[in-house]
């Protein structure tokens, strides 16, 4: 039977049956838990914020460890994404954690394209996963999923409003990743200023249409706490790995001349709230939202570009072969059209070149004729001057000959007079 002949079963036609004995599929949740624990989990965090705002310190504080970090310069030519992957274990749960730092973000004078490197990195991870899915022999079980599950956007504690760079970047990212805005180094402004700053940030995000991640409230188990925590966004956090003695206890805190800011004291900052929401309550939802919402949007757009599309229930579905043939015909038609355009462009170029050559030839011919006329005129002038010169030379030679003849006659006459005088004396 063909696939198109199979009748679709509606929900009304499904029946609920009672079993007369135990079957065993009630162990499916236990099987899933066992498989997940064996396979392990991955979680990828993107930290976006200016250099020196405390991204590395907060990550160390969140996971209660010290990650490898490199000192970042404020003189980067552009934004560079630097991923680091670590294997963590808590009890019998393995976590492959990837932290991606945005090196040089916001350090350039021209910040117009600062977000592009971040967007390109997220799209590249989506593309890598899509290419793995489209393989004939795919291995998603062993594939290291590098898609970004959450973006912690570090906001500079100015106490006034969001920077233009922050608004533009979050607007470009909100359809690609789950954004949780946090106010970094919240101990640098007063509580009253911090409260006003939070209200201002949320107001600007709403007015500019920036969609940040909202903790889910559809699950009764976490609906109440998530609903309360949504009202505390953005979280104002303080990070520190140093331990300070407060009373009889050592706590993680920042020591100042005027007092101590305790990291895990909820009256001092929202670090505990961030850790609860990010790790202990909503980590799996962040992973799920990345796959079912952001990646699916990217995947749908890419498949539509490739020619795939969903069909209405009443229309006959397209097979993969039909889609391939349709796309192939489209590409061949486009190729022929491009070839015809190139051929026509070549013909036009040849005609233009021929016309230019003819114009050049005509110009050269006219120039040649002009030079020929000038040459003839100059030759005639030279010939006339040559004739005049010959006539002058002939006239000169005639006068010279006559002069020489006269001189000869005069010499002979003067030489004969002394001879006559000598003869007369002898006589």
UniProtKB/Swiss-Prot annotation:
Region feature G4 motif, mapped onto this chain: 184-187
UniProt: GTP binding residues: 49-56, 104, 185-193, 239, 254
Annotated segments matching region G1 motif: 49-56
Gene Ontology CC: one annotated term: synaptic vesicle membrane
SUPFAM superfamilies: P-loop containing nucleoside triphosphate hydrolases
Any one GO MF annotation of this record: GTP binding
Record-level GO BP terms: regulation of SNARE complex assembly
Compartments reported by the entry: Cytoplasm; Cytoplasm, Cytoskeleton; Synapse; Cell projection, Axon
Gene3D superfamilies, A to Z: P-loop containing nucleotide triphosphate hydrolases (3.40.50.300)
Bias-annotated ranges (Polar residues): 406-418
Biased composition (Basic and acidic residues): 374-389
InterPro entries in the cross-refs: G_SEPTIN_dom (IPR030379), P-loop_NTPase (IPR027417), Septin (IPR016491)
Region (Disordered): 373-427
PANTHER family: SEPTIN
Name of this chain's protein: Septin-8
Native source species: Xenopus tropicalis
């Amino acid at each position: 039977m063909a696939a198109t002949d199979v009748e679709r079963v509606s929900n009304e036609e499904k029946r609920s049956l009672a079993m007369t004995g135990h079957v065993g599929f009630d162990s499916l949740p236990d099987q899933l838990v066992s498989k997940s624990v064996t396979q392990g989990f991955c979680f990828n965090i993107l930290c976006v914020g200016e250099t020196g705002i405390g991204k590395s310190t907060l990550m160390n504080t969140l996971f209660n460890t010290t990650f490898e970090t490199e000192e970042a310069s404020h003189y980067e030519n552009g934004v560079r994404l630097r991923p680091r992957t670590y294997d963590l274990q808590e009890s019998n749960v393995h976590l492959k954690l990837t932290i991606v730092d945005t090196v040089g973000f916001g350090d350039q004078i021209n910040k117009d394209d600062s977000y592009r490197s971040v967007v390109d990195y997220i799209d590249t991870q989506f593309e890598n996963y899509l290419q793995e899915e489209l393989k004939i022999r795919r291995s998603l079980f062993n594939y290291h999923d590098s898609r970004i599950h959450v973006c912690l956007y570090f906001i500079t504690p100015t106490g006034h409003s969001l920077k233009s760079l922050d608004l533009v970047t979050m607007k470009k990212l909100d359809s690609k990743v789950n954004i949780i805005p946090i106010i970094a180094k919240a101990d640098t402004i007063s509580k009253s200023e911090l409260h006003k700053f939070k209200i201002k940030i949320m107001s600007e995000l709403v007015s500019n249409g920036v969609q940040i991640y909202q903790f889910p409230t559809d699950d009764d188990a976490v609906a109440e706490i998530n609903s309360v925590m949504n009202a505390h966004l953005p979280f104002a956090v303080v990070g520190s790995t140093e331990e300070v003695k407060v009373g009889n206890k050592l706590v993680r805190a920042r020591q100042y001349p005027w007092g101590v800011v305790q990291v895990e004291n909820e009256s001092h900052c929202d670090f505990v709230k961030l850790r609860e929401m990010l790790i202990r309550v909503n980590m799996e939802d962040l992973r799920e939202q990345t796959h079912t919402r952001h990646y699916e949007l990217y995947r749908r757009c890419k498949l539509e570009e490739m020619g795939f599309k969903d069909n209405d229930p009443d229309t006959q579905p397209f097979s993969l072969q039909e889609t391939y043939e349709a796309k192939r015909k489209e590409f061949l038609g486009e190729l022929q059209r491009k070839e015809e355009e190139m051929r026509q462009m070549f013909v036009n170029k040849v005609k233009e070149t021929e016309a230019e050559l003819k114009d050049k030839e005509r110009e050269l011919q006219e120039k040649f004729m002009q030079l020929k006329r000038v040459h003839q005129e100059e030759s005639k002038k030279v010939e006339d001057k040559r004739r005049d010169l010959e006539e002058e030379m002939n006239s000169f030679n005639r006068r010279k000959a006559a002069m020489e003849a006269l001189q000869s006659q005069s010499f002979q006459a003067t030489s004969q007079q002394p001879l006559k005088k000598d003869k007369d004396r002898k006589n």
